[in-house]
Amino acid sequence: QVYAEVLFGRLAQGPPGHAHGGAISAVFDELMGACCWVNGYPAMTAQYTTRFFKPVPLNEDVLYCAEIKEIDGNKISLKAQLINYTGEQFATAKGLFILQDIEKFKEMNLETGANVTYPHLTQ
């Protein structure tokens, strides 16, 4: 599992006083991707869905949690949730990520001069 504590500020506002759904979804995507990578699976998003239950207030700490549910060949299925510290659920997400060839990432790194390292991967 991977966790992230997030506080959405005024620049992430959608409805008055609440976070924009796109900002909420972007964190889900990033966290599910990070969950793959820190577990040794260099993967990219194929698709994800977000289900919203209630608006997320601005300027309040919320907690994201993501976990890998299944690995089938090069397909990695994940689930995630967004709650507050009293356990109130704001949203959930499901994602499908595709395992990538780390050598191709390294080649792209050299070609673009991005200077990205992958110390957590053993491949």
What are the roles of these predicted feature ranges?
Residues 1-19:
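Catalytic strand-loop segment that frames the active site of acyl-thioester-processing enzymes
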Residues 57-58, 69-123:
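HotDog/MaoC-like acyl-thioester-processing domains
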Residues 30-65, 90:
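Hydrophobic beta-strand-centered segment that forms part of the acyl-chain substrate-binding groove
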Residues 4-9, 23, 105-113:
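Charged, low-complexity, helix/coiled-coil-prone segments
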Residues 4, 48-52, 66, 80, ...:
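A structural signal for short, well-ordered beta-strand segments
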Residues 24-28:
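Mid-length scaffold segments of soluble, non-membrane domains
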Residues 8-10, 54, 99-101:
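Non-catalytic surface loops within mature trypsin-like serine protease
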Residues 14-17, 21-22, 33, 59:
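Glycine-centered flexibility sites
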